[in-house]
Amino acid sequence: MGELLADHTTLRLGGPAHRLLTHTDPATWPDVARSASGEGTAPFVLGGGSNTLADDAGYSGTVIRMATHGATVRPLGDDLVEIVAQAGEPLSALVAFAVDHGLSGIEYLGGIPGTTGAAPVQNTGAYGQQISDTLAYVTAFDWHLDRIVELRASDCGFGYRASTFKSQPGRWTILNLTLHLTRSASAAPVTYRHLADAMAVPLGVRPPLAEAAQAVIADREQRGLTLPDSGPDARQAGSVFLNPVLTPDQESAVRRVGGPVHRDQNGPPRASAGWLLEQCGYRPGSRIGPGVYCSTARTLTLTTRESATATSFASALRQLATEVVEAYGIPLCPEPVRPGLTKGSSNVPAMPSHRAVANPSSPNRPSTAGSRPW
């Protein structure tokens, strides 16, 4: 019986790994790779476990827990500075490190759970800033080529919460990132209205770097976007669905009923996944299934209790996605990664052809049958 993955994921779900290796020293990576490459099943790399839904049966192969830490700084000339960060370094710690050194470019990513190495996979972003904005290249181990490679940012296929690493799971293990940041006392311009309001500044203003970083943390804590150490929301994986892309007709329909529509830079219009769930009757604290609830702070974050299983959590995701697509015709894409799924597999079981039945014990949970507003 191997080590439980539940002990290494923030949902605290998951059975045993056949073998778990903890990688702490960058210099020993060749030994780790050699040890893991002899098995038929590709190793699964685990960072902070904050975006992972491990199966109840566990994982039949090797799990590599990335626990390398540290970052180095090198001036590149003028105000440009290079930071090389190890993959196991917590992203929040890297942001704090950059801000403390007066380096701008990732200050709006503070407070996001997870490791630095996971950031390029999801192209982690917040408040109009994403890791690809300042990423120069990624150093990774290519399991197909059996060697360490360097990938330029332009080769990483970055998009909204998307990358080549995400679309080809199992091929690369990210070892470190190289970022190009700017030495500046000012943060990037504020582009999100609620953050500007919280800081009492107009949109487009470049506030002091440290002040912006502190405001981001405070805003995330107030909105339930951080990972608490204890309490009913401690077992979670953050937002469980991506904000879905809208067709022109869907965008018009959402705007017509007062729904929020977001655009990141020059990206396509997206609806708020949380807003769609709320239109289906879900609220903070709603019970979705056995041991699975909306967090007490926000609908889009699901939390688990002692009675939860990975199966019940996956079923809850399926139920929510089914209700939204049947009510609004808008499919939702789940965020949590499931170890063992191959390229082309969905993160959640296939949605049933019949409508999911609303859970009668969910508070503030009105029926949405036949309520499609457009």
Annotated model-derived regions:
Residues 1-145:
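Anion-binding (especially nucleotide phosphate/pyrophosphate-binding) glycine-rich loop
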Residues 314-357, 364, 372-374:
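Conserved glycine-rich phosphate/nucleotide-binding loop
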Residues 100, 310-316:
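Beta-rich strand-turn-strand
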Residues 32-36, 191, 315-321:
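Short amphipathic alpha-helices in soluble, non-transmembrane regions
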Residues 2, 6-10, 52, 148-311, ...:
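Phosphate/pyrophosphate- and phosphate-bearing ligand-binding catalytic cores of soluble enzymes
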